[in-house]
């Protein structure tokens, strides 16, 4: 596990683009993408870079259940606004949050992931150590699944909605085993709110109670973080 301390999110985005550039030179074809505030600077730098995405495939970590793709709070909408409409991929896959049968959708998405193995996966991290929407207690063997969001995750995401009651209570998420199957992983963490989760991820016991701790067992993980997010780690 490699840790790169950056001054801020802007620098973090630049660093991640250069890591991606090196992976593309090694033949990477499929990118695993995330939503939320942490990867935004990466997408901005990627759009402004000379990297061509038109021959690449993307797969996203997750999507809320119950939101249409054109809902401004859906992750389809987020990705279109912040990356796809500026720099499209050859093909982009996201879970369908409006699928009639959510369990069937998880099976379909697992098939998509098996057909498009991820070479380079972007992650954020929740204050409770979740990656994707894999909440504490999620099995490390989990594949794409239907998730009941925890109160802390619903509260954290409420800032994107008019009221907390509008926040979806379920999501479809890649499982931890899906994430760990990626050849290379970059995780972003910014701010003191992420410090405890990062300390556990890097130096704590590997436990399903802190989902991101599983990354200790991956051979190619880079954490890009600011001083506040790294503040509980010993130098």
Swiss-Prot record:
GO terms for cellular component: cytoplasm. The keyword Ligase does not apply. This is Glucosamine-6-phosphate deaminase. One of its GO terms (biological process) is N-acetylneuraminate catabolic process. Coiled coil: none annotated. Its EC number is 3.5.99.6. It comes from the Bacteria. It comes from Streptococcus gordonii (strain Challis / ATCC 35105 / BCRC 15272 / CH1 / DL1 / V288). It holds the Pfam family Glucosamine_iso.
């Amino acid at each position: 596990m490699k840790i790169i301390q950056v001054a801020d999110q802007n620098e973090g985005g630049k660093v991640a683009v250069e890591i991606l550039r090196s992976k593309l030179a090694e033949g990477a074809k499929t990118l695993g993408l995330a939503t939320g505030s942490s990867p935004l600077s990466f997408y901005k730098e990627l759009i402004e870079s000379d990297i061509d995405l038109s021959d690449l495939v993307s797969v996203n970590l997750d999507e809320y259940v119950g939101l249409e793709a054109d809902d401004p709070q859906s992750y389809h909408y987020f990705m279109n606004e912040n990356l796809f409409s500026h720099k499209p991929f050859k093909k982009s896959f996201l879970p369908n949050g409006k699928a009639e049968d959510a369990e069937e959708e998880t099976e379909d998405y697992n098939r998509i992931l098996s057909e498009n193995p991820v070479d380079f996966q972007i992650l954020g991290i929740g204050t409770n150590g979740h990656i994707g929407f894999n909440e504490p207690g999620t099995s490390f063997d989990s594949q794409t699944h239907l998730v009941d969001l925890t109160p802390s995750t619903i509260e954290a995401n409420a800032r994107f909605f008019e009221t907390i009651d509008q926040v979806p209570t379920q999501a479809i998420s890649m499982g931890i085993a899906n994430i760990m199957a990626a050849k290379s992983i970059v995780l972003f963490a910014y701010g003191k709110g992420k410090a405890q989760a990062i300390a556990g991820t890097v130096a704590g016991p590997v436990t399903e109670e802190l989902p991101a701790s599983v990354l200790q067992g991956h051979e190619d993980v880079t954490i890009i973080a600011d001083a506040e997010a790294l503040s509980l780690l010993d130098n």
